[in-house]
From Swiss-Prot:
The modification Phosphothreonine is found at T8. One of its GO terms (biological process) is positive regulation of gene expression, epigenetic. This is Alpha-ketoglutarate-dependent dioxygenase alkB homolog 4. The modification N-acetylalanine is found at A2. Widely expressed, with highest expression in pancreas, ovary and spleen. Actin demethylase activity has not been directly confirmed in vitro; however a number of experiments strongly suggest that ALKBH4 acts as a protein demethylase. Its EC number is 1.14.11.51, 1.14.11.-.
Amino acid sequence: MAAAAAETPEVLRECGCKGIRTCLICERQRGSDPPWELPPAKTYRFIYCSDTGWAVGTEESDFEGWAFPFPGVMLIEDFVTREEEAELVRLMDRDPWKLSQSGRRKQDYGPKVNFRKQKLKTEGFCGLPSFSREVVRRMGLYPGLEGFRPVEQCNLDYCPERGSAIDPHLDDAWLWGERLVSLNLLSPTVLSMCREAPGSLLLCSAPSAAPEALVDSVIAPSRSVLCQEVEVAIPLPARSLLVLTGAARHQWKHAIHRRHIEARRVCVTFRELSAEFGPGGRQQELGQELLRIALSFQGRPV
């Protein structure tokens, strides 16, 4: 596995947090704990099962043995080899990492975007990095990723020494399209999903069969739980590729909790354009220009 790049003492003293965001570095300076590290009240934890596509109640919990469908998640394990993983991270580490919120560092390859005003600029954007060409080509070989053409790549670097995390959030839907694709490198972690919608989730007995047998094995719902009290954990092995679509992309917020970063982790997220920038869309010409630049694979971090 790729060795983690050493960080200087100066880097571990620097902080990129703003507003309510914090990391271990600024918390030591402030002498406070982040509120999201405290156990949330009335939260029931479920674990996503990639074999069935269901979220299953954790062992020894009130909902052990109960589950609900969790569509919109595709997990491809061993998408890259250990050797490819090491080379990808080595190439990333040749370029500078910028400090970011909540103990993260980042490298961005994409247009400059003002999401609030829904405006973007292509100045300075010269494409995705050359080392992503093979990654993008390989994605298109998998069902569900046909025709996936990313116009933005964001590399995020997490490490336990900085207390890296990312708060629950939904990715923008004005510019970014239906499929959100992330490559998890260097260490396993957990993506935590939550939903703030009112109402309840209907639970069934947890399925134990293969997906094609679920129709016959699942009984009618007989329990329910409030959406706002549920968190679904999606385990992400190192070198795995995660695709979020549908409800998992647009309705469930995703986060990485600090406690789930036990070693250096690099996440590479790829985003495609929304329909507004696609064929027949209001900004089709701009979308074509963004694709032309992105898929030249001549980029450096912006």
